[in-house]
Curated annotation (Swiss-Prot):
GO cellular component, one term: nucleus
Residue ranges with Basic residues bias: 70-80
Keyword presence, Glycoprotein: no
Role: May function as RNase and regulate the levels of target RNA species.
Family: Belongs to the ZC3H12 family.
Gene Ontology MF terms in the entry: mRNA binding; RNA endonuclease activity; zinc ion binding
Keyword terms of this UniProt record: Endonuclease, Hydrolase, Magnesium, Metal-binding, Nuclease, Zinc, Zinc-finger
Ranges of Acidic residues composition bias in the record: 35-46
Ranges of compositional bias, category Polar residues: 50-60
Pfam families: Regnase_1_C (PF18561), RNase_Zc3h12a (PF11977), UBA_6 (PF18039)
Protein name: Probable ribonuclease ZC3H12B
Species assigned in the record: Homo sapiens (Human)
EC main group: hydrolase
InterPro entries found in the cross-reference section: Rege-1_UBA-like, Regnase_1/ZC3H12_C, RNase_Zc3h12_NYN, ZC3H12/N4BP1_RNase_Reg, Znf_CCCH
Amino acid sequence: MTATAEVETPKMEKSASKEEKQQPKQDSTEQGNADSEEWMSSESDPEQISLKSSDNSKSCQPRDGQLKKKEMHSKPHRQLCRSPCLDRPSFSQSSILQDGKLDLEKEYQAKMEFALKLGYAEEQIQSVLNKLGPESLINDVLAELVRLGNKGDSEGQINLSLLVPRGPSSREIASPELSLEDEIDNSDNLRPVVIDGSNVAMSHGNKEEFSCRGIQLAVDWFLDKGHKDITVFVPAWRKEQSRPDAPITDQDILRKLEKEKILVFTPSRRVQGRRVVCYDDRFIVKLAFDSDGIIVSNDNYRDLQVEKPEWKKFIEERLLMYSFVNDKFMPPDDPLGRHGPSLENFLRKRPIVPEHKKQPCPYGKKCTYGHKCKYYHPERANQPQRSVADELRISAKLSTVKTMSEGTLAKCGTGMSSAKGEITSEVKRVAPKRQSDPSIRSVAMEPEEWLSIARKPEASSVPSLVTALSVPTIPPPKSHAVGALNTRSASSPVPGSSHFPHQKASLEHMASMQYPPILVTNSHGTPISYAEQYPKFESMGDHGYYSMLGDFSKLNINSMHNREYYMAEVDRGVYARNPNLCSDSRVSHTRNDNYSSYNNVYLAVADTHPEGNLKLHRSASQNRLQPFPHGYHEALTRVQSYGPEDSKQGPHKQSVPHLALHAQHPSTGTRSSCPADYPMPPNIHPGATPQPGRALVMTRMDSISDSRLYESNPVRQRRPPLCREQHASWDPLPCTTDSYGYHSYPLSNSLMQPCYEPVMVRSVPEKMEQLWRNPWVGMCNDSREHMIPEHQYQTYKNLCNIFPSNIVLAVMEKNPHTADAQQLAALIVAKLRAAR
């Protein structure tokens, strides 16, 4: 052993000496390389030098002594290289370090603020940032925060509320469980439950058997909800053994529930072999009412609702119905309907979880379901839950009512039946704001009253309508606005009444004149639109004050055969002429009242009152009649029919000159229903009347007169008004300014057909006042001259000297507005040639 050791030692020494010899050479080469590297890069990393040295050491595998020597050589080199950087830092490097620290602080604060905005606690955020470091990404921080939050919720640590102090998230997560536990524990808030055992058992047994298992299922459902006060009523006879007519299953459940003091048997007994059963429903309702609980049953207890009113209301509000789905007891979530409380609130004395009832709509204001949306809309809290169509209907009704109440007034007139005296209701006529109109007063007034009203220039703003015939009247001595004649008092285009021969041509000429449909005048004679001032009628059956059109279909034309029938009556002197007509009509027409020419223009008789006769006689004597230059004018006025009682009062007091003067006028009367014994003036003879064909006869249909004409005297007959029997005037006024005074023309067979079309009228021009100031005169016996207007009479006479008078008259009747004699002559020649 020793020999081998000795042999080994010299070998080792020799090898060591060889390594020592090689080491200086390697060191010198390494130093040269190191010096060159230092010159190349004075700031090279020390790690590279250490790596090189380590590589060299590994390759050479130095011993411990050799490693020490190597370290001695490397240490001073490191100090020389790194001494300027580490021991003596420059100013630029220190500023860079300070800027880096500031950037880290800013990032830290930014992440802290961002996490705080999300609702996380400051302590939690700090712990996460300290764990991950300030240089961590924001996504990593958020992920760690979320992980910590979920971990705290899963572990159920309540102390983690420090992590989420802001926002309702932590409270919302923990509140449902806690609130439900509190409610379950708080049994005082749950209502007592009274179960109709018979109803529940039979429902579970599908109406075929009494299934006690259904009662157990219902009880278990309420026990799971936390109810402790549960009572089940079952008749006592259900404890008996099952019979084929009354099968019972699982009777042991009844005994079990009875021991638990949940089930109660209602009394029943046998009397002489018969079972006497107490009414268990009364027990159920009474206990539930007294304990302020709920009733679990599908029975409505209609018989008990009648017994007590309080029970009726209680049953309606506290009855909980149910269903069995196989072996599952299922009450409805809305026991009282869609708009009633939820099941949770229904089972409790104090409602909870109101957010379930008023859950906000997820669409918010963008919801398009409207009033049908089952979710809660806070912006619609005060709005009615109606559809858009219902809202439009209601708004339309309100606007209509408002318009009617503000801008219109319904005016109604009443007419009396002529024979039976029956009162007929008038159709409403709309007129704007007529309450203060003095014309809407009763017409039952004395002549003195309406005479005083007639002399007021501004008595009324209601204009009267003007007839196309433009009958001149005598104005009063005082100057005031001249009222217009009422159309209904001037014309009657009914079968049997006369159309002038010139009317057809007048109607044709009217189209070229472009007259407005209906014109009226105000108190100063200015024409204004009738349609604008007064709206149209709502019904053709209306007896309104301003109507110009009549419902001609109401006329009874069966009793009117031909014009000879009426002419014969005129020849027999059936009708008399009122001598004081001029003064009467003068007073009437000067009124602007809408009743003026409608009430007071009479033909054949005036008021029978003595004072009225005296007044009319006085007014007639004050205005002496002077003849026209050609004096062939006929008065065109209203007609009137009287009953037999009027005929007994005798004729009016009149002077003989007046009677003689007016005796030359043709008679104008009403229908043949007027009594034939009506007296005529003594000095008027039938022969004094002209031919029937020359007379302007105005008739009234079926002896119907205006009821307003008789209101001053209750003895007179009351008849419906004339306004629905007659149409408007026959034709408009002539267009020339000097042709307003028309004379009556003879009757023409071609114009005897009834006129069913409404005719237009015009208002009275102011220039007509001058013509109306001329009094009337009697008629001449010349049958042709009284047909021609004054301004055409000379032309007519000249043409008659050349052509046949009948042809001249026919042409002038056909062309009443043609005043040129040459044009008329050309027309006459053309007619003569056509006749050949």
